[in-house]
Structures are given as structure tokens and as C-alpha cells.
Amino acid sequence: MKKILVTGGTGFIGSHTVVSLLKSGHQVVILDNLCNSSINILPRLKTITGQEIPFYQGDIRDREILRRIFAENRIDSVIHFAGLKAVGESVAEPMKYYDNNVSGSLVLAEEMARAGVFKIVFSSSATVYGDPGKVPYTEDMQPGDTTSPYGTSKSMVERILSDIQKADPRWSVILLRYFNPIGAHESGLIGEQPNGIPNNLLPYICQVAAGKLPQLAVFGGDYPTPDGTGMRDYIHVMDLAEGHVAAMQAKSNVAGTHLLNLGSGRASSVLEIIRAFEAASGLTIPYEVKPRRAGDLACFYADPSYAKAQIGWQTQRDLTQMMEDSWRWVSNNPNGYDD
């Protein structure tokens, strides 16, 4: 049984990964500063897993709390989610993103090495590919020109961790580039609760469904896609969580830098997502087509075959289940974790 430190473990993907880790027989310690999550998730995680999870409230840039965590726990590996993730905000406040995401990751890596912990799984993103001009995205594609400081910060941390591993072969660095996580845990107890107006499609749809927003803005209806709207590779958050566990179990004892795409290999359009959500919820989602957003691509999706070959993982849940689980979460928790 391994003890895993999960940074950002009360966030959307982090919390679902905590559930998956515990289900797989691992022990978990969570570090989160709660800047984009709620303390109220902790009793819900206990309800789902039947376990009390050690929680430290703090920041990955805080060496003191990191040293305390490593001193008080025999940590085997770190799964690193902690970071800011709003693309638009990153354009407006780049220094905030580089300080948090890049400097924070560097402090974390330094304190890991100081504690003798050399296994890290990093939550990266398909945004590091930029616009490669072809689909599907494969791991041998070079990172491109990112369209936001958020994407650049992910690319920079990938490079930093890869360089650290080259300099010190004790390290196992696992870089997971994932696509568009949606859905929620099947219990309806945990899900995505963005602060403010959501940046991503499904939380936006959910807020319209809950009556918090009057209609959905669909950015771009003239893309070269079958229905004119942008197409993305959507992945159920529990599939993504299980991908983290599979990658850690398969590769954390193998020195080197391991890069994997985690996606479904299928692209769905904005209108397809709206229709699928309407079918799951029985509601009608009003929407208005607006001009394209700068930097948005027409279509991208993963080639997931390398992940299947390397770690024996592939997605198990289809679009219908993603929508049903999302609707269960939002209908049971109209105010998120604030109920």
C-alpha cells in the first residue's frame, strides 16, 4: 500500500482521483489551498470512500507546509494537480499564473527531492500542443505555440520536470496531457463547482439548467465541422481519475519521463453536447451562437492508443453516462458544495 500526496486534491479532477486511489487500495494525503474548491467536499469524500483523509490546507509555494507533510507522512509518490486553470484570467494576469503554476511546481519538486521522494505524476493539458494543424493528437507531436499563459505554464512545468529527471535519474516523471474532463462521480456527491461564470462548456450548461444563467453562449457557429460548432474530446472525470492511478501504478517505479495522452479518441460538437444533456435531463437548454473566441480551435481529439499500450487504460464511460452523471450532480447540488 502506497501513500500518495495529492496536491489540489479537493479540486474537480483531484477529488475524483482521490476516490480512485482509495478504491485501488492506496493511502492518500491531500494538500489544497481551497482557492477554487470547498472544504465541504471532505465529508463527502469520506461518505464515498468510508475513509478519513488527512488534509493539509496550504499552498504548494509554502516550503514549511510541504516539509511538514513529508516529515509527518511516508510519501511514496506525488500526484500534482494544484494550479490555476482559467484561460481567460491567465491572459489578464499572467504573472499570477506563472508564480502559482510554474514557481509552485518548482518549489514542490525541490521539497520532494529534499525529502527523498522522486515520483511525480503531473496534471498537464492538451493545450500544450497549440495548433498542430492535424488530428488526432499523438504523443510524438512537438508542443506548439500555446494560446494562453495557462497553456504556457503547463508546457513550462513539463519541460522543468523533464530536465530535472535528465539531471537526476532517480526521478520518475509522468506527464499526463488530457483533454476535456466532464461528468461527476456516480454517487452525485462530488462534481465540478467553478467559481463565477464557467470557462468550460458543461459547467456552463449546468448553470443554465439550474436557472443560474439565462442561456448558453455558443462561441462560433461557422467552424469547418459537420454542424459548424467546435468539436472536442470529452472524457468522463472518473475515467481520467482511473487513468492517473493506472499511469502511476505502471510507470512510477520506472525511471524516466513518461508522456501520455488521456482522451477518448472521439470528438463531439457543442451542439451534440447540448442535445445529449437535454436527453439526460429532460430540459431544454436555450443558447445563442456568438462569434468565435480568439485562440479556439475547430476540432481536436486524442489518439489514446499509446496509453492503452503503455498502461492498459482506456475510457469506459460514454457521452450518455457523462451527461447523466453531470445532471445528477447539478440537480442534487444546485448550489454545489454550499448546500
From Swiss-Prot:
BP-aspect Gene Ontology terms: galactose metabolic process
Cofactor(s) for this UniProt protein: NAD(+)
CDD domains (UniProt xref): UDP_G4E_1_SDR_e (cd05247)
Residues annotated for NAD(+) binding in this entry: 12-13, 32-37, 59-60, 81-85, 100, 125, 150, 154, 179
E.C. numbers: 5.1.3.2
Catalytic reactions on record: UDP-alpha-D-glucose = UDP-alpha-D-galactose
Protein's pathway: Carbohydrate metabolism; galactose metabolism
A GO molecular-function annotation: UDP-glucose 4-epimerase activity
Keywords: Carbohydrate metabolism, Galactose metabolism, Isomerase, NAD
Annotated active site: 150
Root EC class: isomerase
Binding site for substrate: 125, 150, 180, 200-201, 217-219, 232, 293-296
One Gene Ontology cellular component: cytosol
Similarity field: Belongs to the NAD(P)-dependent epimerase/dehydratase family.
Subunit structure: Homodimer.
Protein's job: Involved in the metabolism of galactose. Plays an essential role in the incorporation of galactose into meningococcal lipopolysaccharide surface molecules, which are important for pathogenesis. Catalyzes the conversion of UDP-galactose (UDP-Gal) to UDP-glucose (UDP-Glc) through a mechanism involving the transient reduction of NAD.
Name of this protein: UDP-glucose 4-epimerase
Protein source organism: Neisseria meningitidis serogroup C
